Amino acid sequence: MTAIVDIIGREILDSRGNPTVEVDVVLEDGSVGRAAVPSGASTGAHEAVELRDGDKHRYLGKGVLKAVEAINDEIYEALSDMSVQDQVQIDQILIELDGTPNKSRIGANAILGVSLACAKAAAISYDMPLYRYVGGTSARTLPVPMMNIVNGGVHADNPIDFQEFMIMPVGAPSFAEALRCGSEIFHTLKGELKKAGHNTNVGDEGGFAPNLPSADAALDFVMSAIGKAGYNAGEDVMLALDCAATEFFRDGKYVYEGENKSRSRSEQARYLADLVARYPIVSIEDGMSEDDMDGWKELTDLIGSKCQLVGDDLFVTNVNRLADGIRNGRANSILIKVNQIGTLTETLAAVEMAYKAGYTAVMSHRSGETEDSTIADLAVATNCGQIKTGSLARADRTAKYNQLLRIEQELDAQARYAGRSALKALA
């Protein structure tokens, strides 16, 4: 009854109005699993390839009809009549069907859509929530949300070089209360920015994009909003950064255009260490460029014992790159983005490798999202304890938070909010 009888790919729009892939997998028993694929703005050079049509007369070249065609023809033929419950075999067939190291022939967007839709169809067929189907009976940890409330970098049209300034409500007793805390700070920040004469338009991920001159200025506004909302920064709420340093790394220097300043590798490490000393920052993502391996080692040696250092562009959810980082002492955490690697099996393998090495894992969205809330279930399924899925605005972001609220309610007394235990520096 779990045999695949149909696979239907289609072109839909993401949160930026660009085309993306959606897939339905239909089973013999009538179960239908649906998955939509996200897309990034600041993408790592080593990510699996998102296949775009390149026809400038249609969606400015960003159409995904080639990927959809591969789903409806080649992938359907390869998986038709297979049992959907063998996720590992399905994903292996998809990888072999593509035949390239970076999934560039069929496209990681086509492969991921099918991989996730298969898992969702299987869960529906077994009448189980996705987090339970993937994670088993031990899946019960609700993640601490990393809420991106100030946007900069390529996610916003302002002078701030860092891409994201986030709050983490680690002191809340439950996920629902953490969400309330974040919402109250978000709305307080809006009022503070307005009062200071800044615009309160939001960026791709729902955070505000004020015209501020530096990271310090952004952090000061966030700190003020935390206090005025009635919370204690450093106790109830911690701060996190996504520097996205690859985006401003040029000719061996970190070029801060907003500040009209350049920093060497060592100066960049010391600058981040200084921010950690002056603000309650417990997590920094991509503090160094993706290929600045010496910089990553220097930063990890300098502050890795007191701050979570998350590799996104550095690792791109790839076990080979993660293994190299573990061997050489680079970073101490990995950002998990399903579309960076392209299949559910490979995603779960990266999480498992991180855990075994003592690294933390952070489940993450992309800046181009959809209403699909799969990553909320995967965060609980893997018990990773942290999720990064944007601000408290835009339905493509709140869809994930709302799904986590449902999961917490469903788990009831079994639910455990990760809180401070999610971060080794606080545990």
From Swiss-Prot:
Its cofactor is Mg(2+). The lineage of its organism: Bacteria, Pseudomonadati, Pseudomonadota, Alphaproteobacteria, Hyphomicrobiales. Coiled coil: none annotated. The keyword Magnesium applies. It is an enzyme of class 4 (lyase). It is found in: Cytoplasm; Secreted; Cell surface. InterPro entries: Enolase, Enolase-like_C_sf, Enolase-like_N, Enolase_C, Enolase_CS, Enolase_N. The gene is eno. Belongs to the enolase family. GO terms for cellular component: cell surface; extracellular region; phosphopyruvate hydratase complex. This is Enolase. CDD domains: enolase. It comes from Bradyrhizobium sp. (strain BTAi1 / ATCC BAA-1182).
